[in-house]
Regions:
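Short acidic capping loops at alpha-helix termini that bridge into adjacent secondary structure
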Residues: 68-70
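Contiguous, often N-terminal, cationic amphipathic patches that form binding interfaces
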Residues: 1-49, 54, 72-78, 83-104
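Generic structural marker for isolated residues within well-ordered, non-membrane alpha-helices
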Residues: 57
């Protein structure tokens, strides 16, 4: 299982976010007790009034080189565990970009 899944149009990512971190970036993959994988994300923004969620969307936009309007929070608005939807054409090239986030 991977931290992302291709949909008919786009991708759903599972991210475990650490707000208030010392840097913005990704730190590999976290596997929960059920074996579900989450990309570990870190943002310097604090978890107040959606600031950390906004910072995560900006980080994904910058790293994946896509518009922030293509990225939306599906669930986890007030939780460390997030589901993110990316509205883009599912392709091998974009899947490789997502896999590359682990190496960030």
């Amino acid at each position: 299982m991977s931290f992302f899944e291709a949909e008919t149009v786009g991708y759903v990512l599972r991210i475990k976010l650490a707000p208030g971190a010392s840097f913005n970036g990704f730190r590999g993959v976290f596997c929960d007790e059920k074996g579900v994988e989450f990309l570990k994300g870190c943002v310097t923004a604090v978890p107040e009034k959606g600031k950390a969620n906004k910072a995560l969307i900006e980080l994904l936009s910058k790293t994946l080189k896509i518009s922030g309007s293509q990225i939306s929070l599906v669930s986890g608005e007030t939780d460390h565990y997030k589901k993110i939807y990316i509205n883009t054409v599912a392709s091998g090239e974009f899947s490789a970009k997502l896999s590359g986030l682990i190496k960030e």
